[in-house]
Amino acid sequence: MIQSPQTDPPDGSAPHAVGNEPAPAGHTTRATPPDPHDERPDPRFGVLGQLSVHGRTMSVTSPVRRAVLTACLLRYGRPIGIAEFSEILWDDPPVSATANLRSHVTGLRRDLDEVEPGLGDRMRTYRGAQCGYGLEIAPDEFDLPRFTAAVQRGRNWLLSGSHKSAVDALEQAVGLWNGPFGQDLPPTRWFNAHIAGLNNARLDAYQDLFTASVLAGRTIMLAYRIESVIAEAPYRQHLWELLAAVHCLHGDTVSTLSVVNRCQKLFAEDLGLDLPPGIEAMRKAALNWDREEAMRLVASRTQESAERCQCRRPPRPSS
């Protein structure tokens, strides 16, 4: 689960917001994970794919302003200091970085007000030991905490053998995305780390969803969905295993062997690797018309895959 760090700076003195209402002395902001089962409106802010506000793609012409808002969302719950913000936006900050940042924050407030009057007031200026900027937002107004909660819920169901419940939770998780994360963001070290982490988390969620779908017997159109994700991440071995398994479970030996051959050629030509053992095992199952073995192979990977993904969660809104 994503946990929001508190706003207290390392020296113990609390920053205070400068805006419509100053934060009280000693004020801290803690994020509580949203209840995954309540009926809530769509998140106000979205970063899972294209940056969006109220479900609409954010019409911010300046890529730096989009980066400012994205950084504040990823670090929701505490301000970002001026010096750190400069390092986030530029690997080699210009001399005018502070002035540029101030100008972009002012412009971003106007952009937010155009989407929703008064929304720009959420962008706060902080004074004191942690002089900087931050976005006042509750975790249930933001799509990333919802995604993290749904993925964790789905993995728990998957590990417990409740495959249909796992499918439902993981469908909810992947449904929050509208494309890969990181579009139009500056290619700085900070953003590149978050881009890699979040996009891997998205692919992990799809992989778990496809695994749960196979085990739940929900395989209609599943091969098509797996193919679309393989097109994005062609070197994920488990996706190829799942695709071969779906065809094998449908009794389509020709399609199963075609998948195996495509995988073998790709791994050999691009990576210099032999056919992975899991794919070879699926080929044998198809040749033997052994659907039970194909299902057993998928089930045997469930624990291993889920436990691996437990250690590779979306990056915390910090660092």
Language-model features: locations:
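Short aromatic/basic micro-patch
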Residues: 47, 79, 141
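DNA-recognition element of transcription regulators
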Residues: 61-70, 94-116
